[in-house]
A protein has these predicted regions:
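Non-catalytic accessory segments flanking enzyme active sites
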Residues: 1-3, 25-26, 120, 133-136, ...
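A flexible loop/linker signature enriched in serine peptidases of the S9 family
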Residues: 1-3, 18-24, 37-55, 73-82, ...
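Short loop/turn segments that connect beta-strands within beta-propeller blades
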Residues: 7-10, 58-61, 110-114, 163-167, ...
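Beta-propeller fold detector
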Residues: 15-18, 64-73, 116-123, 170-174, ...
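Conserved beta-strand position repeated across blades of beta-propeller domains
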Residues: 28, 86, 139-140, 185
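Residue-level detector of Asp-centered blade-edge/turn motifs that repeat once per structural unit
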Residues: 31-32, 89-90, 142-143, 188-189
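Short beta-strand element of the alpha/beta-hydrolase
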Residues: 262-273
Length: 276
């Protein structure tokens, strides 16, 4: 892969901004246009194994496409993965997710000094495996004072409002009936956040959340879900596996009845083979 900039009017051939890494993802412009950040990694790693957050200074020369200089790594390594860089409103720092301390937590790094600060804690996951480009699990709102985040707790997604100044967290009850959310995106004016959401009895849908009022709106539903009484409610479970390691799973207890079936229903086991 290479990181490049393209003239949307077609006047110039695309210009390479960075090369040398096997893979690139999630490029971001700062709002002031002075910096570009991105994530890169090398084979045989996948981005959730080990990846690097980088940032470079943008140089503009008249009508010619810009170039980058002073590109440097701000976090990440062969055994540390990073995810979803987002510039602060003033462009002096970057927010991102790093699993440096085990779970993927939200961090902030100063571009000038490289000083890093962890903003969330606990045995919760604020990122997700980057299977494809531009997955998003959080959005900065209220002038970067707060973040609306998708947090994974024991395999179930919740939407949480985090005060980035003091770390205070608040689960959003209006979104608690969704067990899976993705593609979190904030409107240009910072007043609305959209996402793709679904639940144990709710088909996948496009939703919008109004930041000032907290009101939830459904824009589009992909399909009609079966009746709730016919659906099993998922339950997280943890058990000891080989070598004393903990294994995690999701259990779906039987619901309803089958005519003619005697004794307990069969237990169907599905094992996920990886790599995540």
């Amino acid at each position: 892969d290479r990181l490049a900039v393209v003239d949307t009017l077609g006047r110039h051939w695309p210009r390479i901004l960075s090369e040398g890494w096997d893979f690139y993802m999630q490029p971001r412009w700062s709002r002031c246009g002075k910096h570009v950040a991105w994530i890169s990694w090398n084979h045989p790693n996948m981005p959730w194994d080990g990846s690097v957050l980088q940032c470079g200074q943008v140089l503009v020369d008249g009508e010619v496409l810009p170039t980058l200089e002073n590109a440097e790594a701000l976090d990440g390594a062969g055994d540390v993965s990073v995810f979803q860089p987002e510039f602060s409103e003033d462009g002096t720092s970057l927010y991102y997710v790093s699993d440096r301390e085990g779970f993927g937590q939200i961090w902030n790094v100063e571009i000038e000094t490289g000083s890093r600060k962890q903003l969330t804690f606990g045995q919760e996951e604020y990122g997700q495996p980057a299977w494809v480009q531009d997955l998003r699990t959080y959005a900065l709102i209220h002038n970067d004072e707060k973040a609306l985040t998708i947090v994974n707790r024991a395999g179930f997604m919740r939407v949480c409002l985090i005060d980035l100044k003091n770390g205070a967290q608040e689960d959003l009850d209006s979104l608690s009936h969704f067990g899976d959310l993705s593609h979190l995106s904030i409107s240009p004016d910072g007043l609305r956040v959209s996402a793709i959401a679904s639940g144990g009895a709710l088909a996948s849908r496009l939703i919008g959340w109004d930041c000032p009022s907290g009101e939830l709106e459904t824009y589009l539903v992909a399909a009609q879900a079966p009746e709730a009484k016919a659906l099993s409610k998922a339950e997280p479970m943890t058990y000891e596996s080989a070598g004393g390691c903990l294994a995690h799973g999701i259990y779906y207890p039987p619901v309803g009845s089958v005519p003619g079936l005697e004794g307990p229903p069969p237990l169907l086991v599905i094992v996920h083979g990886g790599p995540t």
